[in-house]
């Protein structure tokens, strides 16, 4: 089984969702199915079919989260240090064309949210920055062409 890097925060978020699904969502949908069964003919019972569909989604999500947790290699970013960019680093960069500065934390695939400043370890920008240090320029190949970014700062927060 291949281990997947994940921040401690990402692991906690998944664990909380798993607990919510198992303790709140699953019992609620079971109760909804039971109640819908009491309404008679199941073949034309929209409430029953909706609840069964919801149950399928919940069970699928539980299995997906359990798999991610089982494969997780949890990395406590607060215990990392160094000058090189690696998983968990928060990196400040400047676009060499537009002079626009951005700040991103490199996280696991399921944790990525660009609006929140978290980019996936497998993203083109992350792959270009891994192993680099402050002052180095990285090139990222995008559908719109090549973009160059200078690394301004590497932090461990």
From Swiss-Prot:
Described function: Necessary for efficient RNA polymerase transcription elongation past template-encoded arresting sites. The arresting sites in DNA have the property of trapping a certain fraction of elongating RNA polymerases that pass through, resulting in locked ternary complexes. Cleavage of the nascent transcript by cleavage factors such as GreA or GreB allows the resumption of elongation from the new 3'terminus. GreA releases sequences of 2 to 3 nucleotides.
GO molecular function: DNA binding; RNA polymerase binding
Coiled-coil ranges from the UniProt annotation: none
GO biological process: DNA-templated transcription elongation; regulation of DNA-templated transcription elongation
UniProt-listed InterPro entries: GreA/GreB_C_sf (IPR036953), TF_GreA/GreB_CS (IPR018151), Tscrpt_elong_fac_GreA (IPR006359), Tscrpt_elong_fac_GreA/B (IPR028624), Tscrpt_elong_fac_GreA/B_C (IPR001437), Tscrpt_elong_fac_GreA/B_fam (IPR023459), Tscrpt_elong_fac_GreA/B_N (IPR022691), Tscrpt_elong_fac_GreA/B_N_sf (IPR036805)
Family of the protein in this entry: Belongs to the GreA/GreB family.
Name of protein: Transcription elongation factor GreA
SUPFAM superfamilies linked: FKBP-like, GreA transcript cleavage protein, N-terminal domain
């Amino acid at each position: 089984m291949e281990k997947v890097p994940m921040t401690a925060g990402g692991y906690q978020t998944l664990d909380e969702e798993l607990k919510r699904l198992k303790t709140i969502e699953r019992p609620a949908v079971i109760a909804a199915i039971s109640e819908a069964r009491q309404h008679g003919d199941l073949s034309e019972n929209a409430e029953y079919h909706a609840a069964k569909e919801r149950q399928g989604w919940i069970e699928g999500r539980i299995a997906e989260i359990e798999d991610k947790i089982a494969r997780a290699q949890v990395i406590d970013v607060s215990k990392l240090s160094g000058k090189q960019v690696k998983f968990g680093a928060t990196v400040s960069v400047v676009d060499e064309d537009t002079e626009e500065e951005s700040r991103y934390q490199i996280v696991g695939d399921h944790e990525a949210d660009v609006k929140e400043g978290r980019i996936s370890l497998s993203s083109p920008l992350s792959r270009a920055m891994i192993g680099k240090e402050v002052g180095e320029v990285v090139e990222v190949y995008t559908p719109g062409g090549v973009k160059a970014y200078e690394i301004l700062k590497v932090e461990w927060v």
